[in-house]
Amino acid sequence: MFDVNRIRKDFPILEEKIYGKPLVYLDNGATTQRPLRVVEKMTEYYLRYNSNVHRGVHYLSNKCTDANEQARETVREFINAESTDEVIFTRGTTESINLVAYTFGEAFIREGDEIIVTEMEHHANIVPWQMLCERKKAVLKVVPFNDKGELDMEVFRGLLNERVRLVCVAYVSNVLGTVNPVKEMIDAAHALGAYALVDGAQAIQHIPVDVRALDCDFFAFSGHKVYGPTGVGVLYGKRSLLEQMPPWQGGGEMIKEVRFEKTTYNELPFKFEAGTPDFIGVVGLGEALEYVKSIGLQEIAEYEHGLMDYAMRQVREVPGIILYGDAANKSSVISFGIEGIHPFDLGTLLDKMGIAIRTGQLCAEPVMQHY
């Protein structure tokens, strides 16, 4: 049975009072809170086992290395990747997407090629592609969405042609909560010989993800959106593509042999993990995913869906409320405005009541401009 009161006790911050009021935390789209077991696991490694990974033969180094590689296996299982070689640790979704833009972009994008994004993307899935298009003289195409917050799939299909090399789409919109038809878009891209990247930052914590069933070429997400620490994220990539992509950053760990005449690079996934990683953050991410598994992601999804439906019904009854996004397939995010009230004023007022919400452009200005 899904016991929300028991789950709340796993998060000590929810016992806090803000201006004398019980904390109501509704800003999970920006960052989730951490359950106590994640904090305790990271603290254990800082206090008892702290040592660099993949660089020593002593007990502490081996202990941390084993924990990091176990976390990689946890991620692999969580998203159903074929191999841990396809799981690359990064600083977050933004770095994961930039890694693809610089490495896949270097190897696969040529002048005149086209990259497709959607109007509802987070800035992190727009700006790297704009920069790549500037470097390579490629062309960025945009799929619009309607006022319900659903992608115009007819326009998407019309944009597909032999020049398209990459389709980049959010699994779930961070503003609208729309669950996009990513499988359909991936299949359509592949039918023309193009590749597909999925921004999974707002999906990984809400709905089961199976990268092999999706058949996506790349999948990116952040630890701090799924009850893990900040500063750690994941890039999944198909091995066949990762092997063809050049390293992004140079330094320790990503090398096999260094000579002044020539350097050879490490095997996957380490080719893309230059320098000392946030190895204790990785341990925290692994523990966060184990926490989610202990509850059950399907159970979480079902509970959240009921909660969202209830909240949407209640919000519609409030005079002056303007809802943004009412897609038929929607998950976990409700965005709204109130007539005659500036978002920052509303956010400040709610803060005084102990309620934390996100206000502003939500790192998705094109979405805000749509409305």
Task: Name each model feature, range by range.
Residues M1-Y371:
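Pyridoxal 5′-phosphate
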